[in-house]
Each structure stands twice: as structure tokens, then as C-alpha cells.
């Protein structure tokens, strides 16, 4: 057993961030979920012990997340809430104003993590945006600040020009795109890699390698994919609107994949990107 294992159904372990805060290693994301789906999913996740909820201004469901959190009765200090700066709000003042607007929608006094959603390099505003987020952290609106979808170039540019290192870089990461080089860069800068789309949009559910490993442990394909990602040392965000799937996906702390099975899943890497290319994408 390692620090990622424990009793089935227990809360997720936490990972240390570079700013002395901590973050649960596993949480629920709500991208592309309707308000009703979001409220149900967040409520279901909180019920099974999940304490990290990841939303974004661009998802349009921050208010629904806030309602589910309020209805849960769970003390704010026990929760870890992430939201993200929309590309349309980028800029120094834009980032600060957008953070306040997100807090209003969420019904919260602060977020635990505030991320730049996409670098949108063609706009040339991601460095100034991070500067605004530094201010948001300074005034207590965000406990930790970070980036999402940042390549090595954009990450190091932010660090070099603002003299502040993001706490987290949230990136697409699954066995088809294991991001080995970027994970190494993040680690060299003491930035936590947080994976999204860890289940590869279901494309690996019927893969013989994944299924054979799952059968070996008596687990689902999704559980094995999440466990693989966690054992790489990443924090992970998974998405589901189904309460049973949420409970199952969160229940990954009572087993450990052997090195041979980690290697077998790692071997599926072929560079397939299922989400937009950060170098060219200007949406969200």
C-alpha cells in the first residue's frame, strides 16, 4: 500500500501544492453538464466523499455548482473548489473582475484554485492574465492560482515574466496522450500535473489491454484508467453525470496497479489528442 491507497470509500488523499496549500488528488469535473446534471452530479460526488469540484466560467454552470455545495451542508473549509478564467475575460483587470463574477455565481467568498482555462497564445494576454490572478490571490479571492492547457513554452514564460510559479497545470492526460515530457517539465518547476479527460471519452473502455488489467483486479476499465493516472503522480479530474459511475470512479483507493500493468497501459500512448490543441485554440 502507498499513500494513494486506503479503505474503500474513504476520502481522497491530498497532494501538496507549491504555495503551502493542499488539494485532493481526485475530484469531479462538470464540463458540458447542464445545470440539472451539474447539481445532481456534484451532490452525488459530495455524498461519496469527493471534496474537489472543478468548474469554469465557460461551462456556464458555476451557479449550479454553488447550489449543490450550499445544499450539501458540508463546511466550506472541507471543500476544494476550482474555477477557470474564460478566454474572453483574459487580461490583468479582466482576470480580477472575472474571479469576482465567478465567486458571485458560485455563492462563495473564495475559490481554492483559479486557473487560466486556455493560453490562447494568439491573443498574447495570458501573462497579464496571470498577473491579475496574482492580485486575486493577494486579495483573498483565490487561495491558489494556476494554469490549464499550458505547454512547456507557456508555463515557463509565465514563470519567467511574473516570478510566480503556478500551483497547478491542468492538462488533457490519458493513456493515449500520457504527456510524459510535460509532466516532467511541471515536476521540475514543482507544479502539480492535474489530468482531465482521464477516461479518454470512453475510447479505451473496450480496449483489450485495459480490460485484461481490469479483470485481474476485479475493477472497471474506468477505475483502472483513473488508478493508472493517479499512480503516475498526477491529480485527476473525472467527469460523469451518473451517480453510480461517480461512486465507482471515486472508489480507486483500495488497490494498486503492479508495475507491469502500469507499463502495459503506458504503452498505449500514441499522441492522440481528444481535446483542442493549446497552441491554436482560442475558445473557452
Swiss-Prot record:
Protein known as: Aldo-keto reductase MAV_3816
- UniProt enzyme class: oxidoreductase
Residues at the catalytic site = 59 (proton donor)
Q: Does this entry carry the keyword Flavoprotein?
A: no
What Gene Ontology terms describe what this protein does at the molecular function level? aldo-keto reductase (NADPH) activity
Q: Where does NADPH bind?
A: 199, 237, 239-241, 248, 275
State which Enzyme Commission number(s) the record gives: 1.1.1.-
PROSITE patterns xrefs: ALDOKETO_REDUCTASE_2
UniProt lists the family membership as follows: Belongs to the aldo/keto reductase family.
Amino acid at each position: 500500500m502507498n499513500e494513494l491507497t486506503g479503505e474503500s470509500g474513504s476520502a481522497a488523499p491530498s497532494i501538496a501544492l507549491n504555495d503551502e496549500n493542499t488539494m485532493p488528488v481526485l475530484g469531479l469535473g462538470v464540463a458540458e453538464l447542464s445545470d440539472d446534471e451539474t447539481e445532481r452530479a456534484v451532490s452525488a460526488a459530495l455524498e461519496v466523499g469527493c471534496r474537489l469540484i472543478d468548474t469554469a466560467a465557460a461551462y456556464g454552470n458555476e451557479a449550479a455548482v454553488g447550489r449543490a455545495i450550499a445544499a450539501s451542508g458540508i463546511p466550506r473549509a472541507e471543500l476544494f473548489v476550482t474555477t477557470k478564467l474564460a478566454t474572453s475575460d483574459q487580461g490583468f483587470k479582466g482576470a480580477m473582475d472575472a474571479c469576482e463574477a465567478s465567486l458571485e455565481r458560485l455563492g462563495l467568498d473564495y475559490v481554492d484554485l483559479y486557473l487560466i482555462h486556455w493560453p490562447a497564445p494568439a491573443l498574447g494576454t495570458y501573462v497579464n492574465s496571470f498577473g491579475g490572478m496574482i492580485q486575486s490571490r493577494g486579495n483573498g479571492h483565490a487561495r491558489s492560482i494556476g494554469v490549464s492547457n499550458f505547454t512547456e513554452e507557456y508555463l515557463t514564460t509565465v514563470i519567467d515574466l511574473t516570478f510566480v510559479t503556478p500551483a497547478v497545470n491542468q492538462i488533457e492526460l490519458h493513456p493515449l496522450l500520457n504527456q510524459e515530457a510535460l509532466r516532467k517539465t511541471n515536476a521540475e518547476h514543482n507544479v502539480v500535473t492535474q489530468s482531465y479527460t482521464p477516461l479518454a471519452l470512453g475510447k479505451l473502455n473496450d480496449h483489450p489491454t485495459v480490460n485484461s488489467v481490469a479483470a485481474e483486479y476485479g475493477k472497471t476499465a474506468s477505475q483502472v484508467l483513473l488508478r493508472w493516472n493517479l499512480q503516475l503522480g498526477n491529480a485527476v479530474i473525472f467527469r460523469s453525470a451518473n451517480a453510480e459511475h461517480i461512486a465507482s470512479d471515486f472508489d480507486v483507493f483500495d488497490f494498486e496497479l503492479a508495475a507491469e500493468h502500469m507499463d502495459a497501459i503506458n504503452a498505449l500512448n500514441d499522441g492522440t489528442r481528444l481535446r483542442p490543441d493549446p497552441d491554436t485554440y482560442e475558445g473557452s
